[in-house]
Amino acid sequence: MSHVLVNVAWPYANGPRHIGHVAGFGVPSDVYARYERMKGNDVLMVSGTDEHGTPILVEAEKEGLTAQELANRYNRVIAKDLCDLGLSYDLFTRTTTGNHEHVVQEMFKQCLENGYIYKGTQQVAISPSTGRTLPDRYIEGECPICHAEGARGDQCDACGNELDPDELINPVSKINGETPRFEQTEHYFLDLPALAEANKAWLETRKGWRTNVINFSLGLFKEVKPRAITRDIDWGIPVPVKGWIDNPNKKLYVWFDAVIGYLSASIEWARRQGDPEKWREWWNDPACPAYYFMGKDNITFHSQIWPSEMLAYNGKGSKGGETGPMGPLNLPEQVVASEFMTMEGKKFSSSRGIVIYVKDILARYPVDAVRYYISVAGPESSDSDFTWAEFVRHNNEELASSWGNLVNRVANLINKNFGEIPPLDEDSMTNEDRGLLEEASAAFDVVGSSIETHHQKHALSEAMRVVGDINKYISATEPWKIKDDQARLGTVLHVAAQAVSDANHLLAPFLPHSAQKVWEALGGTGTFSPLPELKEVEDLDKPGFTYPIITGDYELGVNVHPWKSEAIEVGAMVPKPAPIFAKIPTEAVEEELARFDEALAARRAAEAERLAAEKAKLAAE
């Protein structure tokens, strides 16, 4: 058994998450974690809500809430949505815990002691109307490098380069359209140039990364500049330096603290297990690989920023230094970044109403239909488009008609003719029988290899190919016509049931909810595919502060079945089957498109009204 660390990008707690978000960080990470558990590996899968930074302050102000109140609201919303989606976190937590604050400050202090954090000045954008510092991504303008419009103050999506707000040409605030003013203020900086050589050398040893991810990551080192890691803001983690720690208007920058969440969540998980040092098995053992799942807009933070922080903490940059008490910390084995998903040809945008939230789609459609569509049509290595027509087609043709109907046919024939799993009569077996069993068994290596190399679309297509071949076997053997040879009928149905069971194992990482139903349809008892649960807990360091976590029991041999062909149990009672998947009426496509258009129009009207009010307010002042 090996240890495997699965780190999942932290959703920002300024609103509910939509289907484009979970297509990048959610379902792919869960498929991988479930597969590794079935392989017998000891997986630690962690994440949580990212809750600091100016965007939360801005949204809270709009709603008349404190930043903590807004974070509390969306922490609960997001945790429930991700739990309902079946994402099997060992711990899904948040960044406003006392534990996270302690770990972040420990990281900062060791990096400072090693010389990789220093004090300097930087121009920051200020809102003339409020006097508040504007977050980088709330400023837009023309990119100074590729001259694309709509570049943000932290990055240009068109060319992928990192930017500072004062580099933009004709910058404006996304909040109210005003032109920001820039002022010099004192900040702490992470000395990325002093870490660049070690960071790049590590990147050059990476193998098996998606081409777009490794090429983009290496491109970050053409020009490396120090990055400010503090902000003039009253919402965030205090800066652990004398003269700063008690300053209410100086906090650590959200991107510095958020990536440390992988480590702090692992430590919190260990503390909640009653074994406070257990996290080290995943973070300090160089043999333990760490896989990071996210959308491509987060590549920079996981192939440059977070590795640089760990190198600084480990004392492995050009300035040397001592490894801190939490180290040495393992750098990522692989950064698994998906591309972007659009919706009906348009870029997802909550503010513009181009969105389908996780909660809404799960309220109307089965969870595994959503997971299947993301897996088969998601943005694995190129941008993809969510369309309602394709969502319905994949569900109806592949899940309901092909897979679900197959399970029902086999279970119904067994129930009707035997009532239990019939024995296999070796004497009546044909080459066709043996061929199907061999194919289904061999598929574990094929599908598993594709999941291990993060080609989940190919893995799913191979699993569904097995489903297709079982359907062909049923059509060719025509068990409903075997009237006078019970031994042969039993053999055909046993072979079919065994192949269906194998296919169910292959599909379980993708379709955990229906996998349980298929298991039970073939006479299985107990848990086959464990699901996560929400639990209300109290903060380990802040008495009275409570919040929900996602956790679960995913122990191999108890709640998790192995990644191999398991012999079905002869004599296991097979009940009259119920449908595993239902077809979605084709009328749903037009209904969803109409709902989408209505929401889009309403959001546009509301946003136009809000901007007009902001401009009128500025004009009056």
From Swiss-Prot:
One of its GO terms (cellular component) is cytosol. The keyword Disulfide bond does not apply. A motif ('KMSKS' region) lies at residues 347-351. InterPro entries: Anticodon_Met, M/V/L/I-tRNA-synth_anticd-bd, Met-tRNA_ligase_1, Met-tRNA_synth, Methionyl/Leucyl_tRNA_Synth, MetRS_core, MetRS_Zn, Rossmann-like_a/b/a_fold. GO terms for molecular function: ATP binding; metal ion binding; methionine-tRNA ligase activity. GO terms for biological process: methionyl-tRNA aminoacylation. Its EC number is 6.1.1.10. It is found in: Cytoplasm. Its cofactor is Zn(2+). Gene3D superfamilies: HUPs, Isoleucyl-tRNA Synthetase, Domain 1, Methionyl-tRNA synthetase, Zn-domain. Zn(2+) binds at C143, C146, C156, C159. It catalyses: tRNA(Met) + L-methionine + ATP = L-methionyl-tRNA(Met) + AMP + diphosphate. Keywords: Aminoacyl-tRNA synthetase, ATP-binding, Cytoplasm, Ligase, Metal-binding, Nucleotide-binding, Protein biosynthesis, Zinc. A motif ('HIGH' region) lies at residues 11-21. The keyword Zinc applies. Monomer. Is required not only for elongation of protein synthesis but also for the initiation of all mRNA translation through initiator tRNA(fMet) aminoacylation. Belongs to the class-I aminoacyl-tRNA synthetase family. MetG type 1 subfamily. This is Methionine--tRNA ligase. It comes from Bifidobacterium longum (strain NCC 2705).
